[in-house]
Amino acid sequence: MPAYSEFEFQNGLLYDYVDNQFPTRLFAWEGQQDFRSDNSTYFGYVFEGEVEVETADNDYRLKARQYFSFNHPIRLRGGRGIVIERIGFRGFNLCGGPVENWGRLKYIDGCTDSLLVPPVKLGDPCLNALFFPENIDQTAHTHPSMRVGMVIEGSGQCVTPERNYDLEPGKIFIIHEDGNHKFRTSSNDKLTVIAYHPDSDFGPVDENHPMINRTIVEGVSAAQIEEIRTK
């Protein structure tokens, strides 16, 4: 399998990773699209326009540069963007944004990133924004699971052993598991990418999270008192 695949912006299913250990489907929508599974979480990003997200419990109106996560069926009306379906996972329901202009976390080679939808627990999927300043020639690297991306601003290249791919706003792509790649920007252009990860090695666990760590019993964190922790 090549390191990288890219897709034209068209309504509907773009790529089916259902047989992966982290089963995932990639969609684009333009105008209207229904997502009906009640056994999935839908991560989405609004690329252009304004979209109404209809759910069984509530309706939401989102604009360009906003993002969402829903763990039940949704209907999208208006605008256009991408939806990544993580099959068999129940995430949180949330909306956020607009995406900022720079990341809150330092990454590699001068790049930064932000967790837009963080893992609720260790191992969960997450949605990120990745920011490349001008004149970046990133260190070549791989990832142990797929990365589903969309260019939301600026321009650059994804460099792979097979070829170099031009990146511009609206480009949708997948970097496949263990695919060797790096990103480049010119001296005149920044680049911002939305990136979905189907798993993580980061996040809270039952024995280590802010609520239990900062609950103090006679000077000792409840995280260290096994007999009172919820079983």
Residue map of PLM features:
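A short glycine-rich, His/Asp/Glu-containing loop-to-beta-strand
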Residues: 2-42, 102-137
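Short, low-complexity cationic-aromatic patches
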Residues: 32-45, 72-78, 118-122, 136-146, ...
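A short beta-strand-loop-beta hairpin characteristic of the jelly-roll/cupin
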Residues: 36-64, 148-169, 179
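Hydrophobic, ordered structural segments
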Residues: 44-95, 200-201
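Conserved metal-binding segment of the jelly-roll/cupin
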Residues: 47, 61-77, 132-135, 160, ...
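Double-stranded beta-helix
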Residues: 80-111, 186-231
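Activation on folded, globular domain regions of eukaryotic proteins
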Residues: 114-115, 138, 150, 156-157, ...
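A mid-sequence, solvent-exposed acidic-amphipathic segment
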Residues: 127-145, 149-154, 158-162
